Amino acid sequence: MTVIAAPRAPYSAIAHLADVSRSELWKLRTVRSTYWTLLAAVVSNVALAALLGILLPSNLSARQDATIDSTRVSLGGLHLSQVAFGVLGVLVITSEYGTGMIRATLAAVPQRRLMLAAKTIVFAVTALIVGIASCLAAYLAFQAFLPAGDGMRTSLSDPGVLRAVTGAGLYLTVLGLLGLGLGAIIRSSAGAIATLLGLLFVPSLLAALLPQSWQDTIAPYLPMNAGETIITVHHQAHTLQPWPGFGVFCLYAAAALTAGFILITRRDA
């Protein structure tokens, strides 16, 4: 008697992506540099916020207290933690090229774009959780050290404050994705990190050498200037509005990731 086997349920692309994502999460969790990099980001963010909360009130007049964007000040550690998030984004992909483990990864997952998509998803979720949590902790630490009745004291319910705090976490996440995209393009840790830092800081320095009218036109669209609009509560002249500015910053990350997805299928491992 012939036995007809029941047809196997189709293995969907979503299920495959979920399996690969679990594998990438396991790899991210078992690498020590992940914990040290994220710890450095959180500590620098919160510690600097607490330090500013202690030192600023005694160095500012009451009039300055009332006009300063204290929410942005409380997130001043972002300039340090952003480097850690960017470096981690780079290492998510370049560390495998450096050790040669990328060959084993691609042998297990021949669909290269699927592999890169899984890395992107896992990193984005991890960075978003840690980024928002660290920025919220930084804001609360800053507020905790301000004297009662100080003009810089704010609440998360005040207009724009919650958006700025959560937006800071979004900024760190997108910056890390920019690093991941550059890592996929360059495939060298040192080269990708140098390119990322150059892209963040060098254009702003060069723009400062231009005539003021040119600065006002160009500077708002530079990566870091555009991205940091999301963490401002008080809009400043010659800068983009928070969400449009953040959208411009996202375009930089999207361009890097798109190039990475294209190149990863056109080059040998």
Regions found by a protein language model. Name each.
Residues 2-14, 34, 38, 42-88, ...:
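Secretory targeting signals
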Residues 27, 94, 105-107, 179, ...:
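Helix-capping/transition residues at the boundaries of transmembrane alpha-helices
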Residues 86-108, 112-113, 120:
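Transmembrane helix boundary and interhelical loop/hinge segments in multi-pass membrane proteins
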Residues 189-224:
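Transmembrane helix segments
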Residues 265-269:
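Short cytosolic juxtamembrane segments of multi-pass membrane proteins
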